[in-house]
Amino acid sequence: MDDQSAGKQYLDRADMALVEVINGVGCIARDSIVNTGTDILFLSESGVRALSRTIQEKSQPMRDISRNVRDTLVDQVSRADKDQIKAVYSDHFAFYLLAIPDEETVWCFDMRAPLENGAARVTRWNGLDHTAWLAFDGAMYMTNIAGIAEYRGFQDNGSKYSMQYYTNYFDFGMQNMVKIVKNIAATVIGSTGQKFVAKIGTDYEDIYTSYNLTVKDAEVSEYNIAEYNIGEYSGAALIDNIRIPAGGSGFVIQVGFESEINGGFLNIQQIDLYVKQGRLN
């Protein structure tokens, strides 16, 4: 290939043309823009958007990946310095991180598969003041006043950290009926002996009934007379199906889980709540 033909591989400004205008959506933070390889993500006035291109239809539908946390996210962004907002995408971890240093908050959007409403699963990391992020060679790096850090393991710089998850309030399709909670069940993947707390709340009251739970202990197997790794490897992944009696009643019910993470991990796969119908309102 000669230089003349090679040069034709690049876009000539004279060949550029406007194909489509997307109204009502614009990027408000330059460093929130990331290319995932199949999509472009960015922060707009209404939250995080994905410019998902459908080649077959020659269209560019806008996907609102922060729909489920829009109000909280937009409120934080409204107070923040937009020039300080940063974002990064990791193909290895399959997440998009949006960091708002002024709020000491990082929003983590799971990009593996969208939810039914098109939004992404999202968690919020609090108390983080990192100012720059880099995904490189399967690793994630970040900077703050203390230096350079790496995202890995299940501790926060050698210390434990708190994990909290709460559902929305739901009425089980019986809006005018009181629901009496009978049992709560959960399928979890976690480290052996990992402790966590299940919580039941009702009718939007800030009062919860707590139930202390523990991931089952792994059985220690011995090969001849030698114990393999002495049976003390706390990072072993276990699947545990937990079901316990629970209480509480109300028109709407909320379920929550809290845990202190300190070297082990906890992954909540499924939640089942068993209720009995009460009186008609």
Regions found by a protein language model. Name each.
Residues 1-22:
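Surface-exposed extracellular loop regions of Gram-negative outer-membrane beta-barrel proteins
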Residues 24-30, 35-39, 45-281:
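Beta-sheet repeat architectures centered on beta-propellers
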